[in-house]
Amino acid sequence: MLNGIVVVNKPRGVTSSDCVYKLRKILQIRKIGHAGTLDPEVNGVLPIAIGQATKLIELMHEKPKSYIGSGMFGRATDSYDLDGKTIAEEKINTPFTSNEIIAGMEKLTGKLEQVPPIYSAVRVNGKRLYEYARENIPVERPKRKVNVYSYELTQDPEYDPLEKTESFNFAIRCSKGTYVRSLVNDLGEELGVPAVMTSLTRTSSSGYDLNQAVDLETIEAEIDTPGKWLQPIDSFFAELPQLQLSPDQFKRVSNGASISLNTSYAKVALVYNGHIKAIYRRQGKIYRPEMMLLKNE
């Protein structure tokens, strides 16, 4: 049985669930799930856990995510991207300088309370926000606490003198639950003009990046050589200190027992026969199991 993480390079025009469905069919596997939904028109890194790795999904969500994208000043939509209905337009007669845009981005960096777009999957009273929007039902959107670690302008903005709009490229590193579309919209609000996100690519998630991402077509063509496209469970815990278990220790760990270890780390990955078999956390003078991965081979 396959165990690990497939870093899928999701194309534009398909949902994250579509990718999981297709990969399930390709691999003929039941235990499968993704970590971090991408909107249909967003491409890039979509980590999909299979087998024992599905135990990691909650932890995978906790790691930062990175994006590159583009936006435009002069237009705003109800969805904050090009899929939505235009709700505001304004000619940009005097384009913003790089320094002005950077100053706006800096105000949107750090710990923020963010209002999600009305066209999003956030639930309010058991119903998704986009369902309220489609039915024209007013709803108060709940603020969410997010952390924007960095929001950077990646090159000088470009001004279109005919359309009187200004385009800009950005890079963002943020916590889970952050809506990048909202950050583009909010940047426009900081500068006093309408703004819309025009493209977005996720470049990293759950500790994996685009260099490790593969197309579903490649997986299907190379299904007999999983070493080319499957990230082992151990790779997810690369930052954790690892301890080798003796046969006697492994027997105790296999039974979920607490054990004494000759280390002082708060959390450790326990290795046996070359694979991580459990994650243990220190409590006082002993270590107790936090996650069991006994079938990780």
Swiss-Prot record:
GO BP field: mRNA pseudouridine synthesis; tRNA pseudouridine synthesis
Reactions performed catalytically: uridine(55) in tRNA = pseudouridine(55) in tRNA
Catalytic residues in the record: D39 (nucleophile)
Lineage top rank: taxon: Bacteria
GO molecular function: RNA binding; tRNA pseudouridine(55) synthase activity
EC number: 5.4.99.25
Family membership: Belongs to the pseudouridine synthase TruB family. Type 1 subfamily.
Described function: Responsible for synthesis of pseudouridine from uracil-55 in the psi GC loop of transfer RNAs.
Protein name according to UniProt: tRNA pseudouridine synthase B
Protein encoded by which gene: truB
